[in-house]
Curated annotation (Swiss-Prot):
Gene3D superfamilies assigned to the protein according to its UniProt record, in alphabetical order: Ribosomal protein S10 domain (3.30.70.600)
GO cellular component, one term: small ribosomal subunit
MF terms in GO: structural constituent of ribosome; tRNA binding
Gene that this sequence comes from: rps10
Stored HAMAP family: Ribosomal_uS10
Name of the protein in its database record: Small ribosomal subunit protein uS10
Subunit structure: Part of the 30S ribosomal subunit.
SUPFAM superfamilies noted in UniProt: Ribosomal protein S10 (SSF54999)
4Fe-4S found in the keyword field: no
TM ranges: none
Physiological role: Involved in the binding of tRNA to the ribosomes.
Keywords attached to this entry: Ribonucleoprotein, Ribosomal protein
Keyword Ribosomal protein tagged: yes
Native organism taxonomy: Archaea, Methanobacteriati, Methanobacteriota, Methanomada group, Methanococci
Sequence similarity: Belongs to the universal ribosomal protein uS10 family.
Organism (species): Methanococcus aeolicus (strain ATCC BAA-1280 / DSM 17508 / OCM 812 / Nankai-3)
Amino acid sequence: MQKARIKLSSTSYQELDGVCNNIKTIAEKTGVDMAGPIPLPTKTLKVTTRKSTDGEGSSSFDRWTMRVHKRVIDIEADERTMKHIMKIRIPEAVQIEIELRS
């Protein structure tokens, strides 16, 4: 039986958990084995910029951060289950990658 590894990433953990719950309910309804969603470490991207563009005045900085949340789901890849997973509405903020394995 083939297995599918579904990798999900997003900057919004609420939308990410919503998609994970949809995949989980599909797996329960079709009766296939599923492992996950396994949370991976959150990546924090930081950018610090100077507020003053000309270099004059006091040194004040803006600090910007973006957090990227990731989840991994391993699921048995039978045709019916994969067809249902492909029909899920995925928000724009969520990136999905499906990898099939033997």
